[in-house]
Amino acid sequence: MILGIGSDLIDIRRVAKVIERHGDRFLDRVFTPAERAKAQRRAANEKMVVATYAKRFAAKEACAKALGTGIRHGVWWRDMGVVNLPGGRPTMQLTGGAKARLESMTPPGHEARIDLSITDDWPLAQAFVIISADPPGRP
């Protein structure tokens, strides 16, 4: 069963301006160490670095919308991180207030699942998040 859906569209140039203005202060406040490491692996191409951050920013916004909280009510930027499953598919890893919110909205006996789609096409980055609850024994 679907528990929440969120989407976000962001202008990559806007993220570039924020990074230029606030630098590490912004990056430390919003992104997990794993997300920062992923972006820095693309350091040879500045546009790819900024697009990587923009996609993850959009994913966090979309996830917060799917949780029904936005970035408030105990859900903070770094409580949500984009990670890749072994096959490469992206998903969200939640901690802190975001994890607590997910647990509170998941029906007893069900397992929460977060599906994430992220993409970019200069100058836009986009993310969709679907949070669902699977009954026991469902793959």
UniProtKB/Swiss-Prot annotation:
Broad enzyme group: transferase
UniProt keyword rRNA-binding present: no
Cofactors named for this entry: Mg(2+)
EC number: 2.7.8.7
InterPro entries noted in UniProt: 4-PPantetheinyl_Trfase_dom (IPR008278), 4-PPantetheinyl_Trfase_dom_sf (IPR037143), ACPS (IPR002582), Ppantetheine-prot_Trfase_dom (IPR004568)
Residue positions binding Mg(2+): D8, E61
Domain of life where this protein originates: Bacteria
UniProtKB keywords: Cytoplasm, Fatty acid biosynthesis, Fatty acid metabolism, Lipid biosynthesis, Lipid metabolism, Magnesium, Metal-binding, Transferase
Task performed by this protein: Transfers the 4'-phosphopantetheine moiety from coenzyme A to a Ser of acyl-carrier-protein.
NCBIfam families, alphabetized: acpS (TIGR00516), pantethn_trn (TIGR00556)
Protein name per Swiss-Prot or TrEMBL: Holo-[acyl-carrier-protein] synthase
Organism: Rhodopseudomonas palustris (strain BisA53)
